[in-house]
Curated annotation (Swiss-Prot):
It comes from Drosophila ananassae (Fruit fly). Coiled coil: none annotated. Keywords: Cytoplasm, Initiation factor, Protein biosynthesis. One of its GO terms (molecular function) is translation initiation factor activity. Component of the eukaryotic translation initiation factor 3 (eIF-3) complex, which is involved in protein synthesis of a specialized repertoire of mRNAs and, together with other initiation factors, stimulates binding of mRNA and methionyl-tRNAi to the 40S ribosome. The eIF-3 complex specifically targets and initiates translation of a subset of mRNAs involved in cell proliferation. Belongs to the eIF-3 subunit F family. It holds the Pfam family JAB. GO terms for biological process: antibacterial innate immune response; defense response to Gram-negative bacterium; formation of cytoplasmic translation initiation complex; positive regulation of Notch signaling pathway; positive regulation of peptidoglycan recognition protein signaling pathway. InterPro entries: eIF3f, EIF3F/CSN6-like_C, JAMM/MPN+_dom, MPN. Its main location: cytoplasm. This is Eukaryotic translation initiation factor 3 subunit F-1. It comes from the Eukaryota. Residues 8-138 form the MPN domain. Component of the eukaryotic translation initiation factor 3 (eIF-3) complex. The eIF-3 complex interacts with pix.
Length: 280
């Protein structure tokens, strides 16, 4: 498959690690680089992890601690054997003169390595994210070169990462003085209530879109229509009585789990107090 047909999907933990490495950089370092880890499947490069590689850039050369990079990769393989090298990342918004030298090293580590640039300066209030592949150029018998060509890049996340991002969004507008140091887990019933409210808001948004399309206020989108049709077909067909019975059964199971968890919590607290009770 051609490198130009690749699509890069980046997980949020990668961006957090890049920002953390940039904040911890040396005072004389203007750019931070590192290795991208993940997997490649059917033209999709999924970046799930990364680590920083210490380096120094001079006018005519680049010095990188390759032994450190190999040690970090070996350690990561022991924990995540499914992750392999898929490319490298760098802070900044542009490809520099030294990028081709660094990319040449990663081309020996994997096929079609991708280069990810992360704009940590937050120009325009956003973190710019770009992905490139290196395309070889030249004529037969002449000098050859390479050109960094942009490829599509998008953000993706697993379900636990999505919950973590939602929790971060809740505290992003809170001042540090009033921000709690610890966030207790939300009760199960409260989570169901919050999820139901969000589902109701999304349903209202969909109904408004459908009404606007019927009233010719909005131009219909075939892609949205197909997604809505697939959504309707995915809903199981059942009567009102069947749905009520199933819902009540799930609520009873949830209440039973909550009761058992509270009993276990009380038992553990009682056991802790009895353990540290001074003997007579």
């Amino acid at each position: 498959m051609s490198a130009l047909n690749l699509t890069v999907r980046v997980h949020p933990v990668v961006l957090f690690q890049v920002v953390d490495a940039y904040e911890r950089r040396n005072a004389d370092s203007h750019r931070v680089i590192g290795t991208l880890l993940g997997s490649v499947d059917k033209g999709v490069v999924e970046v799930t992890n990364c680590f920083c590689v210490p380096h120094k850039e001079h006018d005519d050369q680049v010095e990188a601690e390759l032994s450190y990079a190999l040690d970090m990769y070996d350690l990561n393989r022991k924990v995540n054997p499914n992750e392999s090298v898929v490319g490298w990342w760098a802070t900044g918004n542009d490809v520099t003169n030294h990028s081709s030298v660094i990319h040449e090293y990663y081309a020996r580590e994997c096929n079609n390595p991708v280069h990810l640039t992360v704009d940590t300066s937050l120009q325009g209030g956003r973190m710019g994210l770009r992905a490139y592949v290196c395309i070889q150029l030249g004529v037969p018998g002449g000098k050859s070169g390479c050109m960094f060509t942009p490829i599509p890049v998008e953000l993706t996340s697993y379900e636990p990462e999505t919950f973590g991002l939602k929790l971060l969004q809740k505290t992003v507008g809170v001042s540090p003085a009033h921000r709690p140091k610890t966030v207790p887990p939300m009760l199960d019933l409260a989570q169901i209530s919050e999820a139901s409210q969000k589902l109701q808001q999304l349903l209202d948004l969909i109904l408004k879109y459908v009404d606007d399309v019927i009233a010719h206020k909005v131009t219909p989108d075939n892609a949205v229509g197909r997604q809505l049709l697939d959504l309707i077909h995915s809903v199981p067909h059942m009567t009102h009585e069947q749905f009520t019975q199933m819902f009540n059964a799930n609520v009873r199971n949830l209440l039973l789990v909550i009761t058992l968890s509270q009993l276990i919590k009380t038992q553990l607290q009682l056991n802790e107090k009895l353990t540290f009770l001074p003997s007579a």
